[in-house]
Amino acid sequence: MSGNEGMRAQGSHEHRELRRAELDPDPIRQFLRWFDDAESAGVVLPNAMALATTGADGRPSVRHVLLREADQRGFVFYTNHDSRKGRQLGENPRAALVFLWKALDRQVSVTGDVRRVDDAESDAYFATRPREAQIGAWASAQTSVLRDRHELDERVEEVSARFADAPIPRPPHWGGYRLTPDTVELWQGRPFRLHDRFLYTRDADEGTGWRVERLSP
């Protein structure tokens, strides 16, 4: 199959469907329901999500990160504050997330404002990370240019020696971010691109605080 043919391939969507009556009026509860489905289906890294950010120059940047918590307050991930995404979020604290669970032909897209979580929350999460990952958070000046791999290995050795067998504190340049959603879109794949799409939009006038609308595929 040529590259263009592959791009035009329809895919094999099972005959799942998504009805308005089946949706939870709260998008976070609905997301968590779908997340549980993805875990039950054996999706590898169901918490992997594409995170799109833009800085003051308007140039977009996207990468995959891991969701660490989701509740009524929003979606939490952790990173280096001095990384490209950290700098962009400092300049423009809005972002978009996309989860793709291909085994279920499902996608969830989220947009909203992003704020850092408090230090206590970041400290608590950092303490649960493997020691090697804690060392890496100190050793890696994320997104900065390296002379070669040896330079990074040297930094790891230096950090390891610095803390020896002592507990490793959270670096001041590393911590969590919480995206508070103002829109959540659910996408359920259907045959012939006649997919089911529903958009939750935050709306104070609605009894649930959210307006739900079906979108054209």
Q: What are these model-derived regions, one by one?
A:
Residues 1-217:
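Binding-site signature for planar aromatic cofactors or substrates
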